[in-house]
Amino acid sequence: MGMRMMFTVFLLVVLTTTVVSFPSDSASDGRDDEAKDERSDMYELKRNGRCCHPACGKHFNCGR
């Protein structure tokens, strides 16, 4: 295979991957809602002065 052919195949793979990934984004909407709930729980714990999540645990006591 020549360099042009390899570059063309590379572009086709990249474009195909990009086009295929767009429709699958809408399928993750249900999982996004669950993640938002977990984040809101984390912020509620931060307001109470305790948080066991790694993102806020270094600033607050875990309370366990």
Swiss-Prot record:
Domain of life: Eukaryota
Entry keyword annotation includes Disulfide bond: yes
Name recorded for this polypeptide: Alpha-conotoxin CnID
UniProt propeptide residues: 22-49
Family designation: Belongs to the conotoxin A superfamily.
Cystine pairs: 51-56, 52-62
Keyword vocabulary terms for this entry: Amidation, Disulfide bond, Hydroxylation, Secreted, Signal, Toxin
GO cellular component, one term: extracellular region
Localization per Swiss-Prot or TrEMBL: Secreted
Tissue and organ distribution: Expressed by the venom duct.
InterPro entries membership: Conotoxin_a-typ (IPR009958)
Signal peptide annotation: 1-21
Source organism per UniProt: Conus consors (Singed cone)
Modified residues (4-hydroxyproline): 54
Note: Found in injectable (milked) (IV) venom.
Lineage: Eukaryota, Metazoa, Spiralia, Lophotrochozoa, Mollusca
GO molecular function: acetylcholine receptor inhibitor activity; toxin activity
Domain remarks in the Swiss-Prot or TrEMBL record: The cysteine framework is I (CC-C-C). Alpha3/5 pattern.
Modified residues (Cysteine amide): 62
